[in-house]
């Protein structure tokens, strides 16, 4: 520590050891003596307390956890009026501010550590936790409790303060009075900015800086509160920088970061927009359009894409700049800013810029920073647009330095800047999203590609051409008027004529083609190489299998060389798609047609030799050497083309994006491709990883995938089914069936080819991450001795900054203070018992000569792991985990910490909306609802039994101490007080007395173990405690200076902590909190007075009908409480309007951003936690930003240019998911977060692929705020707001690092529904990211290795899930097509180990060689199986290196035993569905994912309605296909599919708590029946009809207004999807899937090999040309498909008409008439479905496989037809459910439909026809799912074992059964009896409908045998049907190919299935 008093004076901060979080005795409730107690006798013994290990130098009052909080006085002089009585002398200085070293005696005393135990016994006075304040919102005593805290007059009353004055006027800061500066005797000590004091040779005093702010405010019209806020913001920055460098250097570097250096965003914009040319000669003189803009009349749609730009008159393009050689430049050019005659090169311009920056005075630098901050601080939503702020800064500064501004005498009105500059821009952005209808705002249904968003507005200012579009009403351009006039003319700019879309975020899959073109080139190209080489039959004509696959050499080379053409096609498609997304008029768009022409030319060049070989060469010529040489050349050219297109980014194809010294693409270079280069070793590692990935991937794919399809290609491409025919088609369809299968197999193999890459990426990422963990030394596999025994030395060397200590102490003394503070903090959190604490603490013990020495805990020297686990802390406890990680983390390389006084200031920012702040007593001791079986407190006690036991013991001690003062009755029971009976209330609910101070303790204990804001704040306030602890330990001399005045010592420590750390909670809804929420927030402010809350305040409108005024306000725990019981804001800054224009979170963060302080921001969610031992590392963490160097190098010097131009923008940190032990779902969610946030981030950060994920990440405040903030905020598009900060940082030149040694706690969703909601939000958010311009910039500009890292870490993960589900779908289509052949033909013998040849493969004769296809099918199953299971590798490996082999093995098998693979399958489908749905329909939004404990049983109907569309429907379709495949092509591999696909259907119910309880099951069944039937008489929120309507709205959309009224859910409007989007997902895909099911159905009914199809025995042909031959499956399929639909339309019309006739009359006497009518119609439709199923079975000859396949086809046809009807026939959905009720009631009048009354019935007619069919489907599917569960619910004690799997609770600690009243029990029993009878009745009917036909069909099929058929019909019996319907009934199943030998021997027919 330096000797200068400025570095040690004016300390602000908290004591790190002591805090209200851990001190029960120092609360706002001191008068109640709630926690003012001495330690219990059990641990107040001499060894523990009196033998404390701290010297008297810490003063009598030193108690690490005992200091007053919650009162104004404790806040220190910075926030309260100066107390003249305490001003006194400067404790730090004796003469002229110099520090006096202690005497030798003093030093000796401390060196020998000869302390008196009585001087320090308070440190171990283990008292209660300050977080357990006596507080209960539900208690009437709150008023008295609150009033116990003294609050004086408002410390923030600035009514008497002047903001206009000369230097020294002194703007009041944070409540200090104007006389603050007058106390010269105590100036340094009380200085709010200690590093910025006159003693430090300041370039500008704070009064001078203040005058700058006042002057700018007066001239530009800023708000006073905003000015004060920004002044404090600036001074905190200066104080932070000046604490580790000279003040002059601090101001200089700040100016460099904000304005002038190469890393400053403003400088980049200045040159990118050619403002240097504008300042020199004007843009009109350098080719930018000049003259006046002609008058424009707006036409067409509002801001339509086709709207033309303003026409301008262009003067002759003559540049006044002339090129000169550098040597001709005058040497004195440095002294001149710019000269029109100088060189126009970028290099010269930058040289002149640096010269000007060096020549600026510090006043000018401070003025520029102040101006930028004032503009930014009041910019509201414009803060998301950094280049707009840069432009405003340019305009404002041009005015400020003009003579006009210098002559201003009258100040501009306050709010001028907001009202005239910011508000018009805000209003434009607001109007883009909202329109006024009937006086209310309604959100526009405007897709992203028609909405001009933040980025479009911002990018207009990237280029001079965009700035030139800013015009006035008369057409004059802003840029053409003098620079000094522009700022005040900005209100006249016609903003709506300037902006246009700069990138079209069209909802299209084409984005993937452009953004990831290299992924497709790499994979498609290599797939073509492999597959073309192994598909000789496709280019060997004629091919004869008996000759084997012997293609000509030239043809094989040429076929493989087609890869280049494929690559060119992909590149051309990517370029054409880019043309769709990037408007040509945007100056930053690169020419596409030139690139496209070159691509076409390359394709033609590559195609010429291929065409020559295949088109102009015979087979004989293809074997010649010349043709082979041509083929080789074509192959070599294809490799060159393939490699080039794979390596080079799309934007850099055929030329770099920008050349040196070029001005045109500077904006693209600076803002979209300024990627930080990797260090050589990291770059090498990146390349090595991807070389390894693709080497293994290509090798494995070739040998495992490609070679396995080689034989299927040979047999299927040459296979000719013979004698097969169906009516109307003959042999046309069945003849090409093998080739159809081959095409689907090719596509499936291609998808698996993509999946393999991700598999190898996971493997190698894990391998390299593990290797790096060993390099860093963070693996637990390091010996125990190395981790724990060396921990004291590592604490001394890596936690403490001891190099600058003026007084040296023995390391043990310093270490003991840190270690004891950590242990005691865990004790206060009830993680350790007092016995554990005694074993872990350093103790003072007697030594020689009466001295005392410190005894090291045996914990550090223990050699036995078992002893450590059992002796020092509970086994597998939170304390063990935290201490283990702390020890491991210290073994890693950690930057050396700087002294506390020199560390930078930082802020923790926590956005909060409606998250739970503090649990109420009702919430923790009452069951959540009637579906829950356990209270929250009971569940927490089960999860944390040791911690609950510690808490109860602590509470009992507290009660015993307070008992004599509370009432005498307690003391009378002293003898029996500790009996088990008396202790029961403590162990039950944690308290015995209902006094607030006791109930609050229980509430806090529960809140600290749940996902609450209180847990987050209490955890991150540990930063304050850590700073105070470190400052005190490293600077023991300050204790001596204060003597025994502990209060002044505490205030000094508080000042230091407050100076270095701020915690801001952005409580958006604070002003509208409920009473309970407000009381909880007030409790937080009283418990943590330094906590700051930013919120939206509101003033009612001055006039009726006007909008209220909104303000961004800031309060803290020291703010005055006003008469309305609200706190007076410290700052209250008016806003342009409601800042929440997006999805909320990012707007909330942006609103509070001006209130952060310091250089760095840590973004935290409201469900996180932090720990004292982690907070002790904060100095090293901040040092990772690499800005701790204090060398005085001028950032504008030439030498500084060579330094790193890419600062660290984001520092990622580890997360510990503290919800991992909650059960299987919590563990799975935690595992994913741990692996993705830790294991992969470790490698990704090193190879440049990591982005920002919010949670614990630290951000470089200046870098991020000058580049758009900490997130993006366009609604829908930026729903995953935080990752855009990472992409923005990467694009703009920032580096993103990862910190291994620091971690925060994080909560995760715990219930099945909430986890899937989170996955849906992430999946839809990823869909939106695919559309974003950030993905376009990254995908088309990153170098290959970093692009691959980015792709596979982010979009690749989600696309991989999509590919997995697509491969499953394709597999099922292949399976049913293959099964259709297998079922009716004879399959040849096949030996997979033998080479396929004609002689060995066609056995028996006439057979079909399908063995290779079946072998390929098995390989596919194995591939998908491996891909699924590979997801467990990272978690297992992570657990292995973090916690050891045993725990990794245990966790793996616990997950497997708890069916987590089924959950993974379901999650994969949800991800896939989310991204595909979003790209088709949109609708991405923030989904609130509940953070409570999922202990309640959800009804079957809710789960079904929630997951039917994402998963259950597709699972049911797959199951039907799989059932058919199992009956026809059975292999053992299909078992895997049965398990996986069943997971898609049953996973929601399998992971539903208590799903299999017998009584609950049937009560739930009743609810399902009611769910199906309700909602037809009156609207019901939870009904089948409501679910059905909601499902189709994603296609139809909602009517935006009904009867002229605004939408009732403005923010939740679902826009109608575009037809082009829906066509692909809802028309084309269902049509293809329908074809995939129809074609095999036709083949299975084509009777292949039937000799009756031979028309001419003398000249038999395998091909049947007669289209009237065979049965008629086409008509059969049409009948069984259309009858239910026709019946639906018929009943819809009949019942609709009957309702109109009977409804009005019957409705008078029977209110349930509509429901009854609907139930009758639905029941009839159910019976129609049953009849159709039985008829289909009959028509298919009682063949169950054919019937199942028929229903696969029918289901696909119905899906396709209903999609078409919905898309073409249904208009928008009415929000209210009145149309449905009107249909069934017949009451269309009086409903207020207006003219819709004529169209709604027609629409509803179509709806009801569709709904009747969908109802029957849901009825059968729901019952089938319930029937599947019957065997499970019959298992004894199944509910108990099921709960063990879900919650991981032992059977002995199971959640109790629910308790019902007698009446409820009777009712439940009656329900169970009735509905179990209904359930089993329907089950019996289902079984009868299946078993009876199955048995009857078996009898019927025993009729005619094959031999009888031969005897009956000789050859020539042609089965020709004369009538259409004669072939509708399919004959019984007969394998005619089995009789091939008979026909061959008897009639000498020979039909081969192969060529």
From Swiss-Prot:
It holds the Pfam family FKS1_dom1. Residues 95-104 have a biased composition (Basic and acidic residues). It is found in: Cell membrane; Cell septum; Spore wall. One of its GO terms (molecular function) is 1,3-beta-D-glucan synthase activity. The keyword Metal-binding does not apply. The keyword Nucleotide-binding does not apply. Disruption phenotype: Cells lyse at the division site and at sites of polarized growth. GO terms for biological process: (1->3)-beta-D-glucan biosynthetic process; fungal-type cell wall (1->3)-beta-D-glucan biosynthetic process; fungal-type cell wall polysaccharide biosynthetic process; secondary cell septum biogenesis. PANTHER family: 1,3-BETA-GLUCAN SYNTHASE COMPONENT BGS4, LYST-INTERACTING PROTEIN LIP5 DOPAMINE RESPONSIVE PROTEIN DRG-1. This is 1,3-beta-glucan synthase component bgs4. The lineage of its organism: Eukaryota, Fungi, Dikarya, Ascomycota, Taphrinomycotina. The gene is bgs4.
């Amino acid at each position: 520590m330096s000797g200068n008093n400025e570095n040690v004076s004016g300390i602000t901060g908290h004591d790190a050891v002591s805090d209200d979080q851990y001190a029960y005795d120092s609360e706002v409730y001191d008068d109640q003596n709630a926690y003012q107690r001495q330690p219990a006798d059990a641990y107040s013994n001499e060894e523990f307390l009196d033998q404390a290990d701290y010297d008297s130098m810490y003063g009598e009052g030193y108690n690490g956890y005992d200091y007053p909080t919650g009162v104004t006085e404790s806040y220190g002089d910075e926030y309260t009026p100066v107390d003249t009585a305490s001003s006194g002398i400067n404790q730090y200085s004796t003469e002229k501010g110099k520090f006096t070293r202690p005497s030798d005696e003093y030093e000796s005393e401390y060196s020998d550590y000869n302390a008196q135990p009585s001087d320090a016994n308070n440190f171990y006075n283990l008292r209660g936790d300050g977080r357990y304040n006596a507080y209960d919102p539900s208690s009437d005593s709150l008023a008295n409790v609150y009033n116990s805290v003294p609050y004086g007059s408002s410390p923030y009353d600035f009514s008497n303060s002047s903001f206009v004055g000369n230097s020294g006027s002194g703007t009041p800061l944070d409540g200090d009075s104007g006389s603050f500066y007058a106390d010269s005797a105590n100036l340094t000590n009380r200085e709010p900015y200690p590093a910025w004091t006159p003693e430090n040779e300041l370039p500008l005093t704070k009064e001078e800086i203040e005058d700058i702010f006042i002057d700018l405010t007066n001239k530009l019209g800023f708000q006073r509160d905003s000015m004060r806020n920004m002044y404090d913001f600036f001074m905190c920055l200066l104080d932070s920088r000046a604490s580790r460098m000279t003040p002059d250097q601090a101001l200089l570097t700040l100016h460099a970061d904000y304005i002038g250096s190469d890393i400053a965003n403003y400088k980049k914009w200045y040159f990118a927009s050619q403002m240097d040319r504008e300042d020199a000669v004007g843009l009109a003189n350098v080719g930018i359009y000049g003259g006046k803009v002609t008058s424009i009349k707006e036409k067409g749609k509002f801001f339509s894409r086709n709207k033309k730009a303003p026409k301008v008159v262009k003067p002759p393009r003559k540049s006044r700049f002339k090129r000169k050689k550098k040597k001709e430049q005058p040497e004195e050019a440095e002294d001149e800013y710019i000269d029109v005659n100088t060189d126009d090169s970028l290099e010269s311009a930058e040289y002149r810029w640096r010269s000007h920056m060096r020549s600026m005075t510090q006043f000018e630098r401070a003025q520029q920073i102040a101006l930028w901050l004032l503009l930014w601080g009041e910019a509201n939503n414009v803060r998301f647009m950094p280049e707009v702020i840069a432009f405003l800064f340019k305009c404002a500064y041009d005015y400020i330095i003009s003579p006009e501004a210098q002559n201003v005498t009258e100040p501009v009105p306050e709010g001028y800047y907001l009202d005239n500059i910011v508000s018009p821009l805000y209003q434009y952005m607001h109007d883009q999203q909202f329109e006024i209808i009937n006086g209310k705002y309604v959100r526009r249904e405007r897709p992203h590609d028609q909405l001009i968003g933040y980025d479009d507005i911002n990018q207009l200012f990237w280029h001079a051409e965009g700035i030139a579009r800013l015009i006035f009403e008369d057409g004059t351009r802003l840029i053409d008027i003098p620079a000094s006039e522009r700022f005040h003319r900005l209100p006249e700019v016609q903003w709506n004529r300037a902006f246009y879309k700069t990138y079209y975020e069209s909802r299209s899959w084409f984005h993937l083609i452009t953004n990831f073109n290299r992924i497709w080139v790499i994979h498609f190209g290599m797939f073509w190489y492999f597959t073309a080489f192994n598909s000789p039959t496709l280019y060997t004509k004629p091919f004869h299998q008996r000759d084997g696959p012997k293609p000509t050499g030239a043809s094989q080379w040429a076929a493989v060389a087609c890869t280049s053409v494929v690559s060119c096609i992909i590149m051309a498609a990517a370029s054409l798609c880019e043309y769709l997304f990037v408007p040509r008029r945007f100056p930053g768009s690169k020419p596409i047609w030139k690139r496209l022409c070159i691509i076409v030319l390359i394709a033609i060049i590559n195609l010429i030799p291929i065409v020559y070989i295949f088109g102009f060469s015979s087979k004989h010529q293809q074997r010649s050497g010349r043709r082979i040489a041509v083929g080789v050349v074509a192959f070599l050219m294809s490799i060159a083309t393939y490699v080039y297109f794979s390596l080079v980014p799309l934007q850099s194809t055929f030329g770099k994006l920008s050349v040196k010294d070029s001005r045109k693409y500077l904006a693209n270079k600076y803002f979209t491709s300024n990627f930080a280069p990797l260090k050589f070793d990291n770059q090498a590692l990146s390349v090595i990883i991807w070389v390894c990935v693709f080497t293994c991937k290509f090798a494995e794919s070739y040998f495992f995938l490609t070679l396995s399809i080689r034989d299927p290609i040979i047999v299927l491409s040459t296979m000719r089914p013979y004698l097969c025919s169906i009516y109307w088609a003959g042999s046309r369809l069945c003849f090409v069936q093998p080739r159809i299968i081959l095409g689907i197999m090719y596509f499936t193999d291609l998808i698996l080819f993509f999946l393999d890459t991700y598999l190898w990426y996971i493997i190698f990422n894990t391998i390299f991450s593990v290797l790096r963990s060993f390099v860093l030394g963070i693996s637990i596999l390091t010996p125990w001795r190395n981790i724990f025994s060396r921990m004291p030395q590592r604490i001394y060397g890596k936690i403490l900054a001891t190099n600058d200590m003026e007084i040296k102490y023995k390391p043990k003394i310093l270490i003991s203070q840190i270690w004891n503070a950590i242990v005691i903090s865990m004790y206060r959190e009830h993680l350790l018992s007092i016995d554990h604490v005694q074993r872990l603490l350093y103790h003072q013990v007697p030594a020689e000569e009466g001295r005392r020495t410190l005894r090291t805990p045996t914990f550090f020297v223990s050699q036995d792991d078992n002893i450590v686990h059992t002796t020092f802390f509970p086994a597998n406890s939170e304390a063990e985990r935290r201490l283990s990680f702390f020890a491991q983390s210290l073994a890693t390389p950690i930057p050396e910490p700087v002294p506390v006084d020199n560390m930078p200031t930082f802020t923790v920012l926590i956005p909060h909306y409606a998250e739970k702040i503090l649990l109420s007593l009702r919430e923790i001791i009452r069951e959540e609802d009637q579906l829950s079986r356990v209270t929250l407190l009971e569940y927490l006690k089960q999860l944390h039994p040791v911690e609950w036991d510690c808490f109860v013991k602590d509470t009992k001690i507290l009660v015993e101490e307070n008992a004599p003062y509370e009432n005498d009755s307690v003391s009378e029971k002293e003898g029996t007080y500790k009996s088990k009976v008396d202790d029961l209330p403590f162990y039950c609910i944690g308290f015995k007395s209902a006094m607030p101070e006791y109930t609050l303790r229980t509430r806090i204990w529960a809140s600290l173990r749940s996902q609450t804001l209180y847990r987050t704040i209490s955890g991150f306030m540990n930063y304050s405690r850590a700073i105070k602890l470190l400052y005190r330990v490293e600077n023991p001399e300050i204790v001596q200076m204060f003597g025994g005045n502990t209060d002044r010592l505490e205030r000094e420590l508080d000042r230091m902590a407050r100076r270095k750390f701020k915690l801001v909670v952005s409580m958006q809804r604070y002003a509208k909190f409920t009473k309970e929420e407000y009381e909880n927030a007030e409790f937080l402010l009283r418990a943590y007075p330094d906590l700051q809350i930013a919120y939206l305040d509101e003033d009612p409108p001055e006039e009726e009908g006007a909008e209220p005024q909104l303000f961004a306000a800031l309060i803290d725990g020291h703010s005055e409480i006003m008469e309305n019981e609200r706190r007076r804001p410290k700052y209250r800054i008016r806003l342009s309007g409601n800042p929440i224009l997006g999805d909320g979170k990012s707007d909330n963060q942006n609103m509070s951003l001006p209130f952060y302080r310091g250089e760095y921001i840590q973004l935290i969610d409201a469900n996180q936690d932090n720990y004292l031992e982690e907070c002790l590392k904060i100095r090293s963490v901040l040092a990772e930003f690499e800005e701790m160097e204090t060398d005085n190098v001028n950032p504008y010097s030439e030498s500084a240019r060579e330094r790193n131009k890419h600062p660290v923008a984001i520092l990622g940190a580890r997360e510990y998911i503290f919800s991992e032990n909650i059960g299987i779902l919590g563990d799975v969610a935690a595992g994913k977060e741990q692996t993705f946030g830790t294991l992969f981030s470790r490698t990704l950060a090193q190879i440049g692929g990591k982005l920002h994920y919010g949670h614990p990440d630290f951000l470089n405040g200046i870098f991020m705020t000058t580049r758009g903030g900490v997130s993006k905020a366009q609604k829908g598009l930026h729903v995953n707001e935080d990752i855009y900060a990472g992409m923005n940082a990467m694009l703009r030149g920032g580096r993103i690092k990862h910190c291994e040694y620091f971690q925060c706690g994080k909560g995760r969703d715990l219930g099945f529904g909430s986890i899937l909601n989170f996955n849906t939000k992430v999946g839809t958010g990823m869909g939106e990211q695919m559309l974003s311009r950030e993905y376009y910039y990254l995908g088309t500009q990153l170098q290959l290795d970093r692009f691959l890292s980015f792709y596979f870490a982010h979009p690749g993960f989600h696309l991989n899930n999509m590919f997995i589900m697509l491969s499953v779908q394709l597999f099922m289509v292949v399976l049913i097509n293959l099964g259709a052949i297998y079922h009716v033909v004879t399959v040849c013998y096949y030996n997979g180990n033998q080479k396929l040849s004609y002689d060995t493969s066609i056995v028996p004769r006439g057979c079909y060689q399908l063995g290779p296809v079946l072998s390929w099918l098995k390989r596919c199953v194995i591939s998908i199986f491996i891909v699924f299971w590979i997801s467990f590798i990272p978690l297992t490996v992570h657990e292995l290196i973090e916690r050891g082999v045993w725990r990794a093995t245990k966790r793996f098998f616990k997950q497997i035993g708890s069916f987590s693979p089924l959950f993974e399958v379901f999650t994969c489908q949800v991800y896939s569905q989310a991204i595909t749905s979003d790209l088709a329909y949109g609708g991405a939004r923030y989904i609130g994912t509940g953070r409570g404990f999922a202990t309640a049983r959800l009804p079957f109907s809710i789960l079904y309605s929630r997951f039917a569309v994402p998963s259950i429907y597709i699972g049911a379709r797959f199951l039907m296909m799989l059932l058919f495949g199992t009956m026809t092509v059975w292999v053992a591999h299909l078992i895997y599919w049965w398990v996986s696909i069943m997971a898609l259907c049953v996973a929601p119910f399998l992971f539903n708590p208590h799903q299999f309880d017998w009584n609950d099951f049937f009560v739930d069944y009743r609810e399902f029946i009611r769910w199906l039937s309700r909602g037809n008489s009156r609207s019901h929120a939870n009904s089948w009809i409501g679910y059905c309507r909601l499902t189709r709205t994603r296609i139809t959309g909602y009517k935006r207004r009904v009867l002229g009224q605004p939408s009732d859910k403005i923010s939740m409007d679902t826009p109608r999807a575009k037809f082009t989007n829906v066509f692909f997902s809802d028309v084309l895909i269902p049509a293809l899937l329908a074809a995939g099911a129809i074609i095999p159905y036709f083949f299975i009914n084509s009777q292949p090999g039937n000799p009756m199809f031979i028309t001419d025995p003398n000249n038999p042909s395998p091909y049947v040309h007669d289209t009237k031959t065979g049965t008629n499956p086409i008509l059969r399929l049409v009948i069984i498909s259309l009858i239910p639909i026709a019946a639906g339309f018929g009943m819809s019309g009949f019942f609709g008409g009957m309702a109109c006739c009977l409804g009005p009359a019957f409705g008078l006497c029977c209110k349930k008439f509509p429901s009854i009518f609907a139930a009758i119609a639905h029941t009839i439709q159910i019976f129609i479905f049953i009849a159709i199923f039985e008829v289909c079975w009959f028509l298919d000859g009682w063949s169950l496989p054919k019937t199942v396949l028929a229903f696969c086809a029918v289901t696909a046809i119905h899906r396709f037809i209903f999609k078409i009807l919905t898309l073409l026939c249904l208009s928008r959905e009415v929000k209210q459910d009145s149309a449905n009720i009107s249909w069934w009631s017949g009451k269309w009048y009086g409903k207020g439909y207006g003219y819709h009354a004529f169209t709604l019935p027609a629409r509803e007619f179509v709806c009801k026809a569709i709904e009747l069919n969908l109802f029957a489907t849901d009825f059968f599917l729901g019952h089938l799912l319930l029937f599947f569960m019957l065997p499970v619910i019959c298992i004894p004690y199944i509910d108990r074992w099921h709960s063990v799997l879900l919650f991981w609770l032992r059977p002995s600690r199971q959640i109790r059964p629910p308790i019902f009243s007698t009446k409820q029990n009777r009712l439940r029993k009656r329900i169970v009896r009735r509905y179990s009878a209904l359930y089993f009745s329907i089950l019996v009917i289902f079984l009868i409908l299946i078993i009876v036909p199955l048995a009857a069909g078996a009898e019927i099929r025993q009729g005619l045998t094959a031999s009888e058929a031969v005897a009956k019909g000789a050859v020539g019996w042609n089965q020709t049907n004369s009538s259409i319907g004669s072939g509708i009934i399919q004959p019984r199943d007969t394998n005619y190919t089995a009789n091939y030998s008979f026909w061959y021997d008897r009639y000498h027919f020979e039909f081969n299935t192969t060529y």
